[in-house]
Curated annotation (Swiss-Prot):
Name listed for the protein in its UniProt record: 18S rRNA (guanine-N(7))-methyltransferase RID2
Disruption of the gene: reported phenotype: Plants homozygous for the rid2-2 or rid2-3 mutation are lethal. Exhibits pointed leaves. Plants with double mutations in this protein and in AS2 have short filamentous leaves at high temperatures.
Catalytic activity: guanosine(1575) in yeast 18S rRNA + S-adenosyl-L-methionine = N(7)-methylguanosine(1575) in yeast 18S rRNA + S-adenosyl-L-homocysteine
A GO molecular function held by the record: rRNA (guanine) methyltransferase activity
Record's compositionally biased regions (Basic and acidic residues): 255-264
Residue span of motif Nuclear localization signal: 268-275
InterPro entries reported in the protein's UniProt record: Bud23-like, Bud23_C, Methyltransf_11, SAM-dependent_MTases_sf
Its job: Essential protein. S-adenosyl-L-methionine-dependent methyltransferase that specifically methylates the N(7) position of a guanine in 18S rRNA. Requires the methyltransferase adapter protein TRM112 for full rRNA methyltransferase activity. Important for biogenesis end export of the 40S ribosomal subunit independent on its methyltransferase activity. Involved in the pre-rRNA processing steps in the nucleolus leading to small-subunit rRNA production independently of its RNA-modifying catalytic activity. Supports cell proliferation.
Organism, scientific name: Arabidopsis thaliana
Length: 289
């Protein structure tokens, strides 16, 4: 049986009262969530001017990732589809405001009010069709489109994702770029199976070419024996993706004099009235005002 929760049941069913409390009470999960949230907040690259920002936590769950935002002095709102998770967050008295909703139906927030967004292990849920009316491509389109509208100009969105395969990764990237985002994929520990983490870093509006990383860059000169020490190596792989521009169609076939003469001869064989050939046939006319 697969250990991926999105393959077992829809999120609002999988994270019931029992699972929500079990998830929040696990010290291991709390530690992992804190580290991932700190990394996502770092990749947001918010200005270090001491001014609190208004952030969005997508798939906030019981507010574990939101605590990292609060500790950094920011205001935030959290969105989640599991009512049980949000009830636990209320019991824990998290500082952020909470919204119950399906991100696949759009966020429904005002335009340009969010200074940044993070999401920990949530976006890959949109790649599954839990209902007959669900189309992953359309749900991702609605999500990224509404997110682009609610972000302020130049703001970033960072998603920590666990795509099941390459097709899911490409689907998420494609829909993000089509919504207007620029950015790319940041991979921590790309050569480690256990520690590998993928972050989709998107920018609304102007694309910032530099991505701040706290991990050591991969040294290509390291020996092959070091590949087994996954726990000791700290590596980051960055793959930039820009929104592709539409290519202009160019007519590679130039219709010259021979083509015109051949077409005129075909018309004569069909009995049509065709002007006689001359030295001016197929010659380009002068431009006149």
């Amino acid at each position: 049986m697969s250990n991926r929760p999105e393959l077992l049941a829809p999120p609002e069913i999988f994270y019931d009262d029992t699972e929500a409390r079990k998830y929040t009470s696990s010290s291991r999960i709390v530690e992992i969530q804190a580290k991932l949230s700190e990394r996502a907040l770092e990749l947001l690259a918010l200005p270090e001017d001491g001014v609190p920002r208004f952030l969005l936590d997508i798939g906030c769950g019981s507010g574990l990732s939101g605590e990292t935002l609060s500790e950094d002095g920011h205001h935030w709102i959290g969105l989640d589809i599991s009512a049980s998770m949000l009830h636990v967050a209320v019991e824990r008295e998290v500082e952020g405001d909470l919204l119950l909703g399906d991100m696949g139906q759009g966020l429904g927030l005002r335009s340009g009010v969010i200074d940044g967004a993070i999401s920990i292990s949530a976006v890959q849920w949109l790649c599954n069709a839990d209902k007959s009316s669900h189309e992953p491509r359309l749900r991702l389109k609605a999500f990224f489109g509404s997110l682009y509208r609610c972000l302020s100009r130049g703001a970033r969105a960072v998603f920590q994702v666990y795509p099941e395969n390459i097709a899911q990764r490409e689907l998420i990237l494609r829909q993000a770029l089509q919504a207007g985002f620029g950015g790319g994929l940041v991979v921590d520990y790309p050569h480690s199976t256990k520690k590998r983490k993928e972050f989709l870093v998107l920018t609304c509006g102007t694309v910032q070419t530099s991505i701040q990383t706290s991990k050591n860059e991969y040294d290509e000169s390291c020996s092959e024996d070091d590949n087994s020490d996954d726990e000791e190596s700290e590596e980051v792989g960055v793959s930039d993706r820009n929104r592709p521009r539409k290519r202009q169609r160019t007519n590679t076939k130039v219709k010259g004099r021979e083509w015109v003469l051949r077409k005129k001869e075909q018309s004569r064989r069909k009995g049509k009235n065709v002007p006689a050939d001359s030295k001016f046939t197929s010659r380009k006319r002068r431009t006149r005002f």
